[in-house]
C-alpha cells in the first residue's frame, strides 16, 4: 500500500510539472529513477537480477537505463528515426505539398458544403498516413481547402474543426506512435497496421466523418452570427510536379509489395521498415537528380533526412526510453503488480480495464495538449497488465493509442488546434466545442470495434 501511495504522489507531481511545460523526458526519467530507489529501499525487490547486480543501487539503475537505450536505439528507435527522416525529406523537396495538392483537387468538384466537409476529414486521414505532423498537415489544408469550404457556405469554425481533426487517428506504417505500439504489442508494424489498425481505424474514420456532417451543420444553423465571407484563396508555394505525390506513398507500396512477395514465396520475409525507408530515399534521390540535373542540390537536400532522424531521436526516442524508465520504476515499487491484482479481483475483466485506461489516457491528452507524453508513459506497462488479465497486449494498446489521438483534438492547447485557429482568426476554445462530439463518437466506436473484432 505504501508503494501505491508513493506512486500516486509521484504521478500527481509529474502531471503538475508537465502541465507547467517541464520537459516530459526529464520528468518521466527522474520519476522512474526515484521510484526504483524507493522500491529497493522499501524491500520490493532489486532493479536488476541479483546475478547481474553490481552491488550499488545507483550503478544498477544506470545499467538498466543503458540496456533500455541500447535496445531502443538499435531497434524501435532506428525505425522511428528513419521514418521521421523520410518525412522531413518529403517536406524539404515538396512531395508532401504535391500530395495535398493532388488529393484536394477532387474535393473542389463537390458543391455540397457539408459533404465536402466530411470528405475533407476522410481525405485528411488518408494524408495523415504519409504526412505525420498534425500541425503541418493542418497548415497545408488551411491553405488548400479552407478557402473552398468557406466559399461554399461552411462557417470558419466548422472548417477549422474538421481540419484540426484530420489526424485524430494516427495510423499507418510511417507513424511513430504506431511503430512504438507495434513494438510494445510484440509484432511487426505491417502486422499491426494491416491486421489490427486498418479495420478499427476505418470504422472510426467513417463514424467521425458522418458525425462531422451532422454536428457542424447543426452548429452552423444554431449560430446566428455565422459569417459566410469569402476566404482568400492561396496557392501552395513551390509545388513540384504532381508525380511527386507518389513519393510519400512509396514506403507503403514497397511494404505491400514485399508482403505479397513473401506470401507467394518469392521472398523469405517482408522488408524491414528501415530498409523500406532507405530504398525509398534512394529512389527519391534519383527522381530529384533527374528532375533538377543538379547533383550538389540533390545531395544537400538529403541532409534533411538526417536532420529529421536527429529530431526524432531528441523528441520521440528519448520520450520512449523515459517512459520505459518510469514504467520500470512503477514495476520495481510494486504498483504494476498491485494494479494487476486489483483488476483480477475487481470483476471488471480485460474490457473494463481497457476502457478505464483509455479514458485515463484520453483525459491526460486533453489536459496536456499532447498525445505522445501520456501514451508513451503508460504504454510500456500494458504487456504485464494484459498478461495478468489474459488479454493480448495489442487489444489493450491499440484503443489506448487511438484514444489519446482522438482526445488530443479536443484540447484547446494542442498545436494543431492553436495553429489552425490562428490562421482562421477564430478562438481555439470555440473550435474544440465543435470537435468534442465527433471525437467522443470516435472514442466509442474505437472501443466497440476493438472489442467486437478482436476481444
Swiss-Prot record:
GO molecular function list: C4-dicarboxylate transmembrane transporter activity
Topological domains annotated Cytoplasmic: 47-111, 155-159, 211-245, 291-347, 399-411
Keyword Cell membrane included in the entry's annotation: yes
Transmembrane intervals: 26-46, 112-132, 134-154, 160-180, 190-210, 246-266, 270-290, 348-368, 378-398, 412-432
Membrane topology: Multi-pass membrane protein
Disulfide bond as UniProt keyword: no
Localisation: Cell inner membrane
Major location category of this protein: membrane
Example GO biological process: anaerobic glycerol catabolic process
Homology family: Belongs to the DcuC/DcuD transporter (TC 2.A.61) family.
Annotated protein name in UniProt: Putative cryptic C4-dicarboxylate transporter DcuD
Species of origin: Escherichia coli (strain K12)
